[in-house]
């Protein structure tokens, strides 16, 4: 097992000047979005542009954006119109525009927790973890003592059944920001609270996954085993099957070759593959197989799916290695 003192080292992203990237283009006046623009700088110093979207997905996302834009144009100060415009922009990888939309919304509705929740999520996407945490902590403060609400899915699952709520998504993303920075200790109480409050198996497995990894990174193997104890093959998940299979791997109930299927050839890896691959990579790392872990993390980063949490987490692992 890798020593916990090494694994728990906080992540502090290097300061990189975006204007120093010679490949960046300048937006022209009146242009809503230049597809060559830099959306973010990775934790490894790479420029990140638009999301890699398939020819099958792109038209649907663009149609959804047009619908959200139309609703926004009709009611530009309505909080829901603002939120959906920002969400639809973000699905297309237009993250900076989405952040700007949420920021304008906050100027109109400064007490609306949904706006901070969504802007915080997108600050994670662009690797601005401190800003993400500030927004998500603000969102959390705004919902104290208020009833929870189901969060509508932007891309509904197979049963068209939302699995998340406002409160749970605030906490999920806040704890994730701590995890990605390497501040595993601060993530723990948030994960425990969310695990206690989870009302469906999709939430249970997604929270248990990151909670387990946080405990293992801190060298708390017994507590981590306790998180795994209630996980079983019979859990009813709608969209988080990857997390369930990874947890069963960690529990010793699935072989690794049944969890990570070969990546599709000839294109960018899927979000699901990036998520699962990170789970396998960290499993190797936790069991002392550094070379195997490094190989998988590099494969994820080469895959191009830079908005996936598994991609960001793999990037963070590689960035820590550079600074050792």
Model-derived features: where do they sit?
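N-terminal leader/linker segments that initiate helical-solenoid repeat arrays
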Residues: 21-80, 84
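Canonical positions in the second alpha-helix
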Residues: 71, 104-105, 138-139, 160, ...
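Short coil turns that delineate tetratricopeptide repeat
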Residues: 76, 110, 144, 165, ...
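Residue-level recognition of tetratricopeptide repeat
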Residues: 87, 121, 176, 213-215, ...
């Amino acid at each position: 097992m890798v020593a916990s003192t090494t694994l728990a080292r906080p992540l502090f992203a290097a300061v990189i000047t975006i204007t120093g990237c010679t490949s960046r283009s300048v937006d022209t006046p009146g242009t809503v979005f230049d597809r060559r623009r830099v959306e973010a700088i990775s934790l490894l110093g790479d420029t990140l542009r638009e999301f890699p979207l398939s020819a099958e997905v792109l038209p649907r996302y663009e149609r959804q954006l047009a619908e959200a834009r139309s609703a926004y144009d009709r009611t530009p100060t309505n909080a829901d119109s603002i939120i959906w415009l920002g969400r639809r922009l973000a699905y297309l990888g237009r993250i900076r525009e989405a952040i700007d939309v949420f920021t304008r919304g906050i100027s109109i509705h400064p007490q609306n927790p949904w706006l901070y929740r969504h802007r915080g999520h997108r600050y994670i996407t662009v690797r601005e973890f401190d800003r993400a945490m500030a927004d998500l902590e603000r969102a959390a403060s705004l919902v104290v003592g208020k009833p929870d609400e189901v969060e509508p899915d932007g891309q509904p699952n197979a049963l068209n059944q939302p699995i998340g709520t406002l409160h749970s998504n605030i906490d999920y993303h806040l704890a994730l920001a701590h995890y990605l920075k390497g501040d595993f200790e601060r993530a723990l109480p948030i994960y425990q609270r969310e695990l206690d409050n989870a009302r469906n198996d999709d939430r249970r497995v997604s929270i248990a996954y990151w909670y387990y990894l946080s405990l293992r990174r801190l060298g708390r193997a017994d507590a981590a085993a306790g998180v795994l104890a209630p996980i079983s093959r019979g859990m009813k998940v709608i969209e988080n099957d990857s997390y369930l299979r990874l947890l069963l791997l960690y529990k010793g109930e699935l072989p690794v070759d049944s969890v990570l299927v070969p990546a599709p050839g000839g294109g960018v890896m899927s979000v699901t593959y990036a998520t699962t691959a990170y789970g396998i990579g960290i499993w190797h790392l936790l069991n002392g197989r550094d070379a195997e872990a490094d190989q998988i993390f590099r494969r994820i980063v080469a895959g191009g799916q830079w908005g996936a949490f598994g991609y960001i987490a793999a990037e963070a692992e590689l960035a820590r290695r550079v600074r050792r």
